[in-house]
């Protein structure tokens, strides 16, 4: 594979990881938000990175937890308060 094509593929993967599509949003009684996003390959580190990049959308909330429910779905829990 050509270097230019490889760089383009790498940038495409980064763009897909940085812009998860929120498919489900639910509030819990503790005023927490479960942000569900699709990423290419969901592992603990890629899910954490995806949640870290989506913090800009959830300003004023702290990341409480994150996990993968299957190979492509990442859950990020953002809560208000301490």
Curated annotation (Swiss-Prot):
Transmembrane segments: none
Signal peptide coordinates: 1-26
GO biological process terms on file: defense response to fungus; killing of cells of another organism
Gene Ontology cellular component terms for the protein in this record: extracellular region
The organism's place on the tree of life at top rank: Eukaryota
Localization (cell): Secreted
Keyword Transferase in annotation: no
Location, primary (coarse class): secreted
Cystines in this chain: 32-79, 42-68, 47-74, 51-76
Keyword field: Antimicrobial, Disulfide bond, Fungicide, Plant defense, Secreted, Signal
Family: Belongs to the DEFL family.
Protein name: Putative defensin-like protein 134
Species of the source: Arabidopsis thaliana
């Amino acid at each position: 594979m050509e270097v230019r094509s490889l760089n383009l593929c790498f940038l495409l993967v980064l763009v897909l990881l940085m812009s998860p599509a929120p498919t489900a949003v639910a509030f819990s009684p503790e005023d927490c938000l479960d942000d569900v996003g699709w990423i290419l390959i969901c592992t603990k580190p890629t899910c954490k990175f995806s949640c870290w990049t989506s913090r800009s959308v959830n300003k004023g909330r702290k990341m409480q937890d994150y996990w993968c429910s299957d190979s492509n779905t990442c859950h990020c829990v953002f809560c208000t308060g301490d």
